[in-house]
Amino acid sequence: MVKRIKNMSELKELFSDAGNKLVVVEFSAKWCGPCKTIAPVFQAMSLKYQNVTFAQVDVDSSKELAEHCDITMLPTFQMFKYTQKVTPFSRLKRVLCCLRSGPKSKMIFECHGADAKQLEKKIQELM
């Protein structure tokens, strides 16, 4: 199941509840074509990988959170895990951390676009 996140408080609570589990957050918008394409795949992944926490942020209704997380492309997927930080990889070759002053979860991966194979491969790798 994909949990809808509306603000930073809900995101912090999600990380707290996730404990040591991998957290995958999708930043998307209703008007975004690639977001619509990947949405059912993301939902299916949430059912397939029950030991991973999945969340979705609508950037139009959660502008402050999207800005805080430096979202510039849609869809963007950010993966977080408790305090240990793994070497990050990004198609844009940059590391963006959504939680500069939040809970102890760290972003360990970010990807952009509706590439379901890459997303699933990275989830399997980081679980």
UniProtKB/Swiss-Prot annotation:
It comes from the Eukaryota. Gene3D superfamilies: Glutaredoxin. One of its GO terms (cellular component) is Golgi apparatus. GO terms for biological process: cell differentiation; spermatogenesis. Residues 2-127 form the Thioredoxin domain. It is found in: Cytoplasm; Golgi apparatus. Disulfide bonds join C32-C35. The keyword Oxidoreductase does not apply. Testis-specific. Only expressed during spermiogenesis, prominently in the Golgi apparatus of pachytene spermatocytes and round and elongated spermatids, with a transient localization in the developing acrosome of round spermatids (at protein level). Keywords: Cytoplasm, Developmental protein, Differentiation, Disulfide bond, Golgi apparatus, Redox-active center, Spermatogenesis. It holds the Pfam family Thioredoxin. Its main location: cytoplasm. Belongs to the thioredoxin family. May be required for post-translational modifications of proteins required for acrosomal biogenesis. May act by reducing disulfide bonds within the sperm. This is Thioredoxin domain-containing protein 8. The lineage of its organism: Eukaryota, Metazoa, Chordata, Craniata, Vertebrata.
